[in-house]
Curated annotation (Swiss-Prot):
Coiled coil: none annotated. Keywords: Acetylation, Transferase. Residues 88-211 form the GST C-terminal domain. The lineage of its organism: Eukaryota, Metazoa, Spiralia, Lophotrochozoa, Platyhelminthes. This is Glutathione S-transferase class-mu 28 kDa isozyme. Homodimer. Glutathione binds at Y10, F11, R16, W41, P42, K43, I44, K45, L53, A55, V56, E70, S71. It comes from Schistosoma mansoni. The gene is GST28. Gene3D superfamilies: 1.20.1050.10, Glutaredoxin. SUPFAM superfamilies: GST C-terminal domain-like (SSF47616), Thioredoxin-like (SSF52833). InterPro entries: Glutathione-S-Trfase_C-like, Glutathione-S-Trfase_C_sf, Glutathione_S-Trfase_N, GST_C, GST_superfamily, Thioredoxin-like_sf.
Length: 211
């Protein structure tokens, strides 16, 4: 997106914006990362089309503004623009399959959000002893089927980025949950960071946030 200014607007967290941020980082695209506090959100909300975050504001050289909404649609758009959705129809399917599997895990994680602590702990226990292990095993099987070291072949795709964003959310719920299990997921992250120094640097330097 040469000549364009890209602003990613979200709260001060990883959340639904992280796959967008990581896609831009992995593609080597500069962007402005605007993080909004919950206190400031009510006065900023009317300025965002649809009043929802994340949103991306793209301003061209002539000052024309384009708003982009819906987190995964934005991430897919950016990934496609920068050749990160697979090189063949088969790879595209594999990318989308892994995104779907990761989103199934994300759906479970979302059940814990905005809940009182006692209820959150109860839900966390239920999902980590229920659907999440099943879903993670499905992801491991998909990773085993890759023709390369990454999620789909040897080039970074959106599947890699959505996956590690979701795995970080699982770790947020229980820091030791993945320890000694799911070797394919651990190896995938190791291979991804080795394949993309830009992404490795971003992850090591990004601010610690609760979500």
């Amino acid at each position: 997106m040469a000549g364009e200014h890209i602003k990613v607007i979200y709260f001060d967290g990883r959340g639904r914006a992280e796959s967008i941020r990581m896609t831009l980082v992995a593609a080597g695209v500069d962007y402005e990362d605007e993080r909004i506090s919950f206190q400031d959100w009510p006065k900023i909300k009317p300025t965002i089309p649809g009043g929802r975050l994340p949103a991306v504001k793209v301003t061209d050289d002539h000052g024309h503004v384009k708003w982009m909404l819906e987190s995964l649609a934005i991430a897919r758009y950016m990934a496609k623009k920068h050749h990160m959705m697979g090189e063949t129809d088969e790879e595209y399917y594999s990318v989308e399959k892994l995104i779907g599997q990761a989103e199934d895990v994300e759906h479970e994680y979302h059940k814990t959000l905005m809940k009182p602590q006692e209820e959150k702990e109860k839900i966390t226990k239920e999902i980590l002893n229920g659907k999440v292990p099943v879903l993670l095993n499905m992801i491991c099987e998909s990773l085993k089927g890759s023709t390369g070291k990454l999620a789909v072949g040897d080039k970074v795709t959106l599947a890699d980025l959505v996956l590690i964003a979701v795995i970080d959310h699982v770790t947020d719920l229980d820091k030791g949950f993945l320890t000694g299990k799911y070797p394919e997921i651990h190896k995938h992250r190791e291979n991804l960071l080795a394949s993309s120094p830009r992404l490795a640097k971003y992850l090591s330097n990004r601010p610690a946030t609760p979500f």
